[in-house]
From Swiss-Prot:
Stretch list, region Disordered: 28-58, 223-278
Species the sequence originates in: Nocardioides sp. (strain ATCC BAA-499 / JS614)
Matching Pfam families: Ribosomal_L2 (PF00181), Ribosomal_L2_C (PF03947)
Role summary: One of the primary rRNA binding proteins. Required for association of the 30S and 50S subunits to form the 70S ribosome, for tRNA binding and peptide bond formation. It has been suggested to have peptidyltransferase activity; this is somewhat controversial. Makes several contacts with the 16S rRNA in the 70S ribosome.
Basic residues compositional bias, start-end: 268-278
The entry's keywords: Ribonucleoprotein, Ribosomal protein, RNA-binding, rRNA-binding
Protein name: Large ribosomal subunit protein uL2
The protein's assembly and partners: Part of the 50S ribosomal subunit. Forms a bridge to the 30S subunit in the 70S ribosome.
Alphabetical list of PROSITE patterns matching this protein: RIBOSOMAL_L2
Gene from which this protein is expressed: rplB
Phylogenetic placement of the source organism: Bacteria, Bacillati, Actinomycetota, Actinomycetes, Propionibacteriales
Cellular component, GO annotation: large ribosomal subunit
Gene Ontology biological process terms in this record: cytoplasmic translation
Family statement: Belongs to the universal ribosomal protein uL2 family.
Length: 278
């Protein structure tokens, strides 16, 4: 993938860029692998906003992605097409299995039309093949990693992301996550070899607010520019700092306020955050 930049013919075009989509081989999805995706606008079943800054955007169909691949062990497949998916930053690959079934997977880097892929403990170590961590050599770059055996891929699924198998001892493997975090994962968990493709996606300059609206993202208004009735940071004469520690519109402290999860016990070294990133 490469980035195509526009000439500044209008203010919205100035500095904006798009993906060139050269790797895409088909523009219409496989109909049997799509489902309707109704718009919620960030509302729940009571009509109340539960997720702010969502709404509008282009109509989409959801593509069913195979994040497990267990039931296709030993069944080879051929990459029929590399396709665009509006629901994720990565590209997706349509697989035609020799038994006649078709499935989508996340397309790794360098996976091309006509490539043979397979899954299972005896699969070769090459991009697109899915194996248990106990069968993958230490040092291999992987993506679409499970956190629990049989739970489906959860880690390193977006464009350009990958994890690395750093060590393996007994029933646990050590992974270096995309964030730099180090954690233990069961060696029975599956992962796909290679890194996710479309890495240049992060370099796209969207150019104008309207392109974000096409994606279904609405404006994020700062609390300090609101009125007191709308936000705890609102009001005041002139420009103010808010006058208190950052809080949500409902007065709850913002930032890292979540309790630890049970799986946090598997973390060896946390990712660097804030000032520690430097």
């Amino acid at each position: 993938m490469a980035i195509r930049k526009y000439k500044p013919t209008t203010p919205g075009r100035r500095g904006s860029s798009v993906a060139d989509f050269v790797e895409i081989t088909r523009t219409t999805p496989e109909k049997s692998l799509t489902r309707p995706l109704p718009k919620k606008g960030g509302r729940n079943n009571q009509g109340r906003i539960t997720t702010r800054h969502q709404g509008g955007g282009h109509k989409r169909a959801y593509r069913l992605i195979d994040f497990r691949r267990y039931d296709k062990d030993g069944v080879p497949a051929k990459v029929a097409h590399i396709e665009y998916d509006p629901n994720r930053t990565a590209r997706i690959a349509l697989l035609h299995y020799v038994d006649g079934e078709k499935r989508y997977i996340i397309a790794p880097k360098d996976l091309t039309q006509g490539t043979r892929v397979e899954s299972g403990p005896n699969a070769d170590i090459k991009p697109g093949n899915n194996l248990p961590l106990r069968n993958i050599p230490v040092g291999t770059t992987i993506h679409c990693v499970e956190l629990r055996p049989g739970g489906g891929a959860k880690i390193a699924r977006s464009a350009g992301n990958s994890a690395q198998l750093v060590a393996r001892e007994g029933s646990r493997a050590t992974l270096r996550m995309p964030s730099g975090e180090m954690r233990f994962v069961d060696v029975r968990c599956r992962a796909t070899v290679g890194e996710v493709g479309n890495a240049e996606q992060s370099n796209i300059n969207w150019g104008k607010a309207g392109r974000m609206r096409w994606k279904g993202k609405r404006p994020t208004v700062r609390g300090v520019v609101m009125n007191p009735v709308d936000h705890p940071h609102g009001g005041g004469e002139g420009k103010t700092s808010g006058g208190r520690h950052p809080v949500s519109p409902w007065g709850q402290p913002e930032g890292r306020t979540r309790k630890r999860k049970a799986s946090d016990s598997q973390i060896i070294r946390r990712r660097k955050t804030g000032k520690n990133k430097r």
